Amino acid sequence: MFSETLMPRFSETDALGHINNTALPVWFEAARTPFFRFFTPDLDCNKWKLIVAKIEVEFKGELFYGQEITINSSISRIGNSSFVICQEVYQHNELCAVGHATMVRYDFDKKASVALNDTEKAQLMEHFKAS
């Protein structure tokens, strides 16, 4: 599991005084960076090997500006050419949101998915957490 700590920005609040729902997918993407490095260690977009096939966010509670959040990211499924990253957002040790991102190993030249190799699967398995 990877863990990332972020401080919500004022610009991420809405008229109701809590963090806007549009902020979480951005936070989740930032917290997926360690997984991206398995496929593109230098994060060079010209060598990118992943696409997002699906994202989901389930809100469990409110999140507030100026109060640190923690995002825990783990792998919940590994397929032939895809895997699912499960992400949980905590504020004050309370679970506030859960996200899932289905990532696909992709060849941009062929415009097709590619099977995960054994090394990639092994790296992902190190962060596997059954849901």
Task: Give the ranges of each region predicted by the language model.
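Hot-dog-fold acyl-thioester-processing enzymes
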Residues: M1-K54, F108-S131
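Hydrophobic beta-strand-centered segment that forms part of the acyl-chain substrate-binding groove
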Residues: F35-F83, C96-A97, V104
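HotDog/MaoC-like acyl-thioester-processing domains
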Residues: M1-S3, F64-Y65, S76-S131
